[in-house]
Amino acid sequence: MNKVRVRFAPSPTGSLHIGGARTALFNWLFARHHNGTFVLRIDDTDTERSTEASYKEILAAMGWLGLDWDEGPEKGGQFGPYLQSQRLELYRREAARLLNEGKAYLCYCTVEELAERRRQAQAEGRPPMYDRRCRYLTPADRTRLEQEGRQPVIRLAVPETGTTVVKDLIRGDVAFENATIDDFIIFKSNGMPTYNFATVIDDHLMQISHIIRAEEHLSNTPKQILVYQALAYELPAFAHVPMILAPDRSKLSKRHGATSVEEYRDEGYLPEAIINYLALLGWSPEGEEEIIPLEKIIEQFSLERVSKNAAIYDTKKLTWINGHYLREGNLDRITRLALPFLQAKGLLPDPLPEKDYNYVRSVIAAVRDRVKTLAEVADAASYFFTDVTNYEEKGIRKHFTRPGAAALLDEARERLATLPEFNAQAAEEAYRSLAEGKGISTGQLFHPTRLAISGRTMGPGLFEIMELLGRETVLARLDRAARWIRENLA
């Protein structure tokens, strides 16, 4: 294979959608697998919808995911600039060449005229295509129309017969009859190129070898091939990756939950989990595993293992994968990532005093096995940082309503108060001794204690919680719970 050069070319008209992130990832993986070049280009010719905020957000999302680009904004490269809005002269030059060679023409039809002709064609049962009337204008016709003050667009003169074949590396050959393709606009009357024109020129000048993009772009590809041919450019390879659908097989949208990378980041998902999950949307690894290190994905990635069939987006699986990376990730890194979520809930000061870091780290080590996102860390860990003022209702019914529950907590409190050393092992030994002496099961003692000191019925090991909270806090919470039982359940 010749030198691989691929690109991801988002439009800065919104956040980086999860589908766009998957396309970027597949391009990045293909480049890394082949020791090629991954180019980031910003297709910002839609001046009405493109914003600086979206541009910055896309770059931030790409950086957060770890999809580093070799050429592009903030990196530069020999084929820049990498924003289409800074390349307009290149497009104008090539459009002028097509006009001079008779491969494109000026069209003076107004929006109103085109709309009326479309309505008429539909009423007569004809395809609502442009009727090519400006294709054969005489110089005198053009002069007259320009004198009327009409601002022309430029249309490509599409062959009226024959077939344009997309040789797709995933879908095989896909044929389009030229008779069904409009003489489409390549330059708008406002002096801006259309997507199907500008992208061809950029991909050619940037020496892109493979265009890997979403299936919804397949219908644009014959038009782009016609532009390649008109400009006498060599064709790149095309690969259209499958659509991503919601579980009900509808188009993925906000009603199915988060759809942008930024939203997932803010909900506490880890970039490595999103990368792992997105890689599996349409691509199959060599084995059956679902947790795959990035190095292994790069090593195995190929377009031959990309499916033609739509991928079903399963948030539950993403969340499960995220839970794995939370449990297995470097504890200091997970702690740093969790801090903003704890601070946003008012559980920790911002900035965190350095003296408190080890305690927070230990708490996260205790709770991370039972959470799936960083946002869940804040909820799971809250009682380590704030007083327990409420108890779970099901826990109250099951554990606090037992006869003698308050007295049992009092006895447990006294045992803990007299321990020479207060740690998990000593607390557990004291509790087991107390349960044995009273002839009750350990659960009858452990469960009400957990509820008393955490407000929860589930969580980390009871004695791990005790050691982290410390003797003073544990005793105070046992006192409060016993008092609450007497005041509310007596």
UniProtKB/Swiss-Prot annotation:
Any one GO BP annotation for this protein: glutamyl-tRNA aminoacylation
Indicate whether Nucleotide-binding appears among the record's keywords: yes
Q: Where is this motif: 'KMSKS' region?
A: 251-255
Q: A cellular component term (GO) from this record? A: cytosol
Cellular localization per UniProt: Cytoplasm
Q: Which reaction is the catalytic activity of this chain? A: tRNA(Glu) + L-glutamate + ATP = L-glutamyl-tRNA(Glu) + AMP + diphosphate
Signal peptide interval: none
Q: Which keywords belong to this entry?
A: Aminoacyl-tRNA synthetase, ATP-binding, Cytoplasm, Ligase, Nucleotide-binding, Protein biosynthesis
Recorded E.C. number(s)? 6.1.1.17
Domain of life where this protein originates? Bacteria
Chief place where the protein resides: cytoplasm
Q: How does it assemble?
A: Monomer.
> What name is this protein filed under?
Glutamate--tRNA ligase
